[in-house]
Amino acid sequence: MLKRFFYTLLLLTTLTACASPTPTAAPTPKATTTVEVTQPELDWWRTAVFYEIFVRSFYDTNADGIGDFNGITQKLDYLEDLGINAIWLMPIHPSPSYHGYDVLDYYAVNPEYGTMDDFKNLLNEARERDIHIIIDLVINHTSSQHPWFLEANSNPDSPYREYYVWAEEPGAGSWHETENGYYYGYFWEGMPDLNYNNPAVTGEMLKITDYWLNEIGIDGFRVDAVKHLIEVDGKLENTPATHAWLKDFYTAYKAQDPQAYTIGEVFGAGSSVVKIYTGSELDHIFNFEMSSGFVNSTNGGANSGIVSAIKFAQMDMPDFNFATFLTNHDQNRVMSVFNGNMDKAKMAAFLMLTSPGTPYIYYGEEIGMQGQKPDEDIRLPMQWNADEFAGFSTVEPWRAAQIDYTQVNVEAQTGDSASLLEHYRALIHLRKENSTLQTADIRLLDAGNSGIFVNLRVDANGTYLVLANLTEEPISEYAIDLNQAGLAESFVGVEMLFGEGQTQVPERSGDSFQPYQPFESLNPYAMYVIKFIP
Ligand SMILES: [Ca+2]
Ligand SMILES: [Ca+2]
């Protein structure tokens, strides 16, 4: 399509080489300790539980109907109690749009959300609570009102001209006409794509990452639309040039801050694609295959979706070093996918929070907020209580909250052990207190019934049985085959970590376990985590 796509990245390499990259990924073993089990220290994001926030909709503290940084600061106690220990803020920069994915100034914060001092205060208060904060980094494109683009568009001789992608004639894909030729903007005309074949653009982006990591002190970035960075010859996604650019980017930002974390959005990626980007290009990728597995197995009452997602992961990403989620800000809210079915919402949360992979919870998911597209309606004000405007603001919000807020809200669910909020809280704390649930190996088991999902999580810290009845009917026809798990030891006790009831130890005769039926009948949507004591 365009010859300039074949530029080499030599200049970029030179640029990043000056930054004396520090090797970072190598885990350092803990010094001798009195604890029996010693493990290599994991990067902080491997054991985190993230919470995605749309700032505009979280909490308004200055009565303008728009959520703000101070609002998040005021709600940090809520988030800490919930148990999350990392936050992803959707775009916080000045922008002409309500969502912020078209940036006007990468060095400033959106004045509607507060001042830079407000933002720094949020960072400090979060740090006090051991909560990490990452922000959206929108690098594929700027706003068409960004000063770079205004200059590039009005003056073809400007050095900013080559910050973007131009052609005399519209080619394949999304080209937009101006007085001085056509520019490429994959998503829409208001978002002109940056030209990463131009080392100057790469230099600008690294200045921006350095500013946020080292001047401001954030912990990393969620990198937007990462598969679209560099188009080559009409190929618009996942090009070798994009991968090459990301490899240099990885070296550069790790040199700026060895503890910095990036997670890339590769929309729709399953484990085989996640694998290509992870480790040498970005720290994490969202695994959409796992997400569909959690949601579809729950919705359909059959284990095939989650079982195949896990099998794909075992093949391509056996350490499950990726991020998981149920739905995000680009998808209908998961409670709407489940038509308001509380049992299903609880089941999906259980599947995600007992599986390996770093979970991301979308704000409001934990109380069962609903929302279906258009996009504005999946990003509505958080429902804090039954007061007017859902307790989000004292004035009419930027967009009205869902009408169910009088029943569905944080205040109503807090302390109610049957609520979705307390279910999330219990599962998050269970995960944090049992590192096996975070990062251990997962071994799928067969129970002879497609309505049952059962696996063992096994590492040096313990052996945990995760068991769920995905259906709305009781199941008594089942038996778990523990022999598939390759367990060497016998067990003398069980500890019920999640779920009601008492159960017995799996019996072993000789080399093999008897078929295991921890409960005669599994109630509809029953969920258990049982620790086996050797
Ligand atoms: Ca406000
Ligand atoms: Ca692009």
Tell me what each language-model feature is.
Residues 5-13:
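Sec-dependent N-terminal signal peptides
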Residues 1-4, 19:
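Positively charged n-region of N-terminal signal peptides that target proteins for export
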Residues 145-191, 293-315, 379-405:
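Core domains of carbohydrate- and sulfate-ester-processing enzymes
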Residues 18, 36-206, 210, 226-270, ...:
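Acidic/aromatic-lined carbohydrate-recognition and catalytic surfaces
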Residues 41, 45, 253-256, 261, ...:
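Loop/helix patches that line or flank the sugar-binding groove of alpha-linked glycan CAZymes
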Residues 494-516:
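Solvent-exposed beta-strand/loop surfaces of large extracellular or lumenal domains
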Residues 508-534:
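C-terminal beta-strand-rich structural cap/linker in extracellular carbohydrate-active enzymes
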